[in-house]
Structures are given as structure tokens and as C-alpha cells.
Amino acid sequence: MHPALDILGLVAVIGFVAAGARRVGYSEPLVLVAVGVVISFIPHVLEIVLTPDLVLIGFLPPLLYAAAIRTSLVDFRANRTPILVLSVGLVAFSTLAIGLVAWWVVPGVSLAAAFALGAVVAPPDAVAATTVARRVGMPRRIVSVLEGESLVNDATALVALNTAIAALMQHSSVSPAHIAWDFVRAAGGGVLVGLVAAFFLAAIRKRIEDPVLDTTLSFAAPYVAFLPAQQIHGSGVLAVVVTGLVLGHKAPVLQSAGSRIAENINWRTVQFLLENVVFLLIGLQIRPLINGVRDDHVPWSEVIPACAIVLAATIVARIVWVFGVAAVFRLLRTQGAWSWAVTAVVAWAGMRGVVTLAAVFLLPPDTPGRNEIGLAAFTVVAGTLLLQGLTLPWLVRRLKLRGPDAAEDALQAASLVTDAARAGLAVLDEVRSENDPAEVLDQLRERGMRRSNQSWEHLGRAQTELEPPAATYYRLRMQMLSAERGSILAARDTGRYDDEVLRAALTNIDMEEAMLDRIEDAAARLDDELVTSHHRAGDCEHLREAPRVAEPSTLNGCEECVRDGTRWVHLRLCLACGHVGCCDSSVGKHAAGHFAETGHPVMRSFEPGEAWRWCFADDLLG
């Protein structure tokens, strides 16, 4: 078959399977692995063997970079302790534990080769963890920890694997000092090269205004970091992650809005293709692995139980480490220690991916039991993706861990956008001149507050059947844009206008329509969230019946405090009428006074990042 047809076939399978999985609500990685397994046994299908260069150089750098630029550097820093405990401590523990088990059960495997297998299967996969965690709807802190762990742990695992390979080739032990030096060199070199690459690329990016050139530079960025780090025996993985984190954090300052939008869209497309190709290729590896074991003439009665035991050891090692570390943190009363529910989810979220399979091929070809090690690695990848990936949503629901709250997000967004609008209006008052037309200033003020008003309107949409002004604007403006586009297309058919003029006019309409679609999609997601019941045991009748949000009567703080000339400490929002009053720690205690005056029992915090409610009538926290 022609290579072009092979590529077309891969893309077609990926598109069809991904669309089908999304339609029925299944995880794309799981379905693609299963489809790959089935395809691998179809006669005359091209056999694609994963090689270390293909995965570690072709796939891994862009996939890590795509994940890193979307990872919050602030969240990464805030969760650095659990990330390091998982990405370094857990990988080392898993390597030792799985290695000892593999040495015991896998036929014909030496101790060094067994530890190599332990290093191969120790790190969870960045793509698998991110895909499943976001689809499940885990709390954001868990997602941040899992993303951070999966971005960094490959570096630790590759150091452990290189150490095991050195022992295999030298047929001698490797000293702890040698292992420590390898790790320090890999980590230090990777971080250093990553920082240098990030600041080098940032200096270039400052001078680029063309979104096409900026996106081209972005595609080169992973390799600008990865290849030099590998040359100095540093961790290319860490270099890519550091570069991605820094450039993603600085993107709003370094890039124009057009460049950021173009980069985001292009990387989402690249990430979609690479991620799904990776999982399809994982499934396609099963037939060559089985053929290799068959050629070794090892009894299947020994191989199958050994692979199952290695899979079990991989899962158990993570559970033991995560629960053990969580217990220590709780005993030490460490700030931010996980609850047992969070601990259970983190312990179970250990899906492996393509790096595990590719790393097997780094072993020397004459390694005893190499085919059996490869099949064991595939068993771990497929087993964790299927077993943990399928049961993780059930576990999250069973433990009643709630994911991101759309209503709380909307409340924070409304507060944030309001503050931003005030900042913009303040700058307008500073920079305006006497010669600026009054109608232009009025238009700018109106536009500055419109986004703020739209944000607060979204909060009240589920509480009323009346169409908010922003929704009315969206409905009518979309009809206008459709008519405008039709007029331009009709003019195009007459041949009276230049093509470049027509394309520019259509682009302007497309950009406005895309912006309106994003605003309306966010509002629709909020509506879906607000109509979902979130009753919990222990809530009183007032808390159960009260709405979760209400449109505030003012955005300027406590009205009574403003009137009396006093200062408030924190603000509270009445969920019956939207009155904004100060808390009991404030001098006026106007929120409590509002309850005494009106009898409205339930209020909620009106502070960014806080979603708790309080019933004055029953003195109960909701």
C-alpha cells in the first residue's frame, strides 16, 4: 500500500472513532486502543512498529509542549510538593517494587532487566491522565496535580531506565552515587536548557507580529528545548515542560491577541491528531509483541500470569505510595493535606501510555526476555487504560467529588470582568483629551461595561424565563450577520468585487460571529449546570430551595457601608433579592441586618473563589 494511503487511513480511522466515541460518551483513548488491537489482527494490514526515535523525538516533545502551554504555572507552583512526591518519589518506588515482582514472575528476566521493566511502566502518561481527568470532571486541584505529575515523571523514569540499561550492558552493579549524579545532571540540565530556550524564544516572539510566523515559531519550540538538552545528557522532557510552562505563562504579554488565538487553534488540532495517533498505535502493537513471545517459545501458561501480576503490582504500588504519603502528610498536619476521597482518586488515576511502550525498545536487542518485557509493558498500558480509565468516573461519583462548578466559575468571571472594566474605564479617564469626541467616549464607556453586565446577566438566566439583554443581542445580531454574509456572497457571484476585498469582509463577519458563539456557549454551559440538582445530605430546607446565584443589586460593595461612610471586611449576597451587604466581621453587619429586616434566610459569599452559603434561620452552612 502507498504510504499516502496509510496516512489517509490512519487519519480516517482517528476521525471516525473519535467522533463516534464523543457521540456515545466513551473515552477516546480507550476506544482507539481497542480499535487498534482489532485492526492489528486483520490480515494484510500494515504493521507499524513503534521505535524510540518515533515516540521520544517525534511524538513526545510536541505532546508535552501542547500540555505544558495550557498548564497554569501558578497552579504548578502551588502544587509543587505533591507533584514532586508523585513524579520523583512514586516513580522511584514503583521502579523498585515492580522490578522485584517482575524479577520473580517474568520468565528469563535478569534483575537489571526487571528493574528496566519497572522504570518503563512506572510513569503515568501525560496524555492519558489529562484526557481522562478532564472528561471525568474531577476537581481542578486533582487535575492540576495529575497534569503536573505526568509532565515531569518521564524524566525520572528515563533516568532509572538508563541506569538499568547501563547495568545490563556492563553486567555489573551501578553505584547509588552514579544514579544520583545521573538524576541531578538530567534534572538540572533539563531545567537550565528549558529556561534558556524559553527566554531565547520569548526574545524572538516579542519582535513577531504576524500570527503565521508566531505559530511557526511555536511549532519549533519543543525541539529548540528538547534537542540541546539531550545533547548535554540533560532531560529533554524537563526542558520541553519548562519551556512550555514559561511561554504559556508569558503568552498574554509576548503575543498579540491574533497570535494567541491562532496558536491555540493550531496546537489543538496538532494535539488532537498526535494524541489519537498515539493511542491507535498502542493498540496496533499487540500482534508483533505476541509474535515475538511466540518466537521465544515461552509457554503462555507462564507469560499470561506474569503479565497479569506485573499489571497488579503497578496498580498496587501506586495505591500503597499515595495512601502512605497522604497518611504522613495528615500526621504532620501539612497544609493542604488531601482528604481520603481525593487520595483514593489520585491513587487510582495511574493510566499509562505510549512512552511506556516506546521505552521498551530502548533495551538492547540481546536483552534476555525482551519480548516478554514488551508484552508485560503492553499489558500494563492496556490494562490501566481500560480498568482504571473505565472505573475512574464511577469512583469520582461514588466518592461525591464535585468537579468545576459552572455557576461558581461564572460568579468569579463576573467579578473579574467587572474589575477589569473598571480598570479600563479608569485608564480612559486618564488618557482622554478635550479634543476627543464625546460620542466616542460614551461609546467606549458603554462597551467597557457591556461585558460586565453580560457576565452578571448569565448568572440570573436560570432563575427567570425572561430573555436577558445579552441573549437578545446575540439572537438578533446573529440573524443580522447571516443576512450580511448572504449579501456579500451574492455580490461575490456578480464578479463586481475583487476577491481580496470579499475575503476581508467575510473574515470580519466570521470573527464577530465566532466571538458571539464563544460567549453564548459559555452561557449555555452555565444554564445546564444551574438546572442540575446539587442537594446534599445535611442541607436545611431553606438551603435546598434557595437559588445558587442571584443578580446583585450593586457592583460597588455594601450600599449601607457606602452610605454610612464605613468599611466592609467581606461581602455577602442575598440569594432572594440580590442585596449586597457586609459580613458579621464588619462594623455594620448589614447582611445580618438585611435578614432581620426582610426575613430572607439564605446568603452566599460574594468574594471571588468562595461558593459557600449560609442559612440565617437555621444557623447552617451549606
Enumerate the language-model features and the residues they cover.
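Cys/His-rich, Zn2+-coordinating zinc-finger modules
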Residues: 534-557, 564, 579-622
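Transmembrane helical cores of multi-pass secondary ion antiporters/exchangers
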Residues: 1-415, 419-422, 489, 493-496, ...
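Canonical RING-type zinc finger of E3 ubiquitin-protein ligases
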Residues: 566-575
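Short loop/turn motifs at secondary-structure junctions and domain boundaries
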Residues: 269, 563-565
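In a subset of proteins, long, contiguous C-terminal domains/tails are tracked
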Residues: 2-6, 500-533, 576, 594-622
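Short, positively charged
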Residues: 42-43, 257-258, 469-470, 547-554
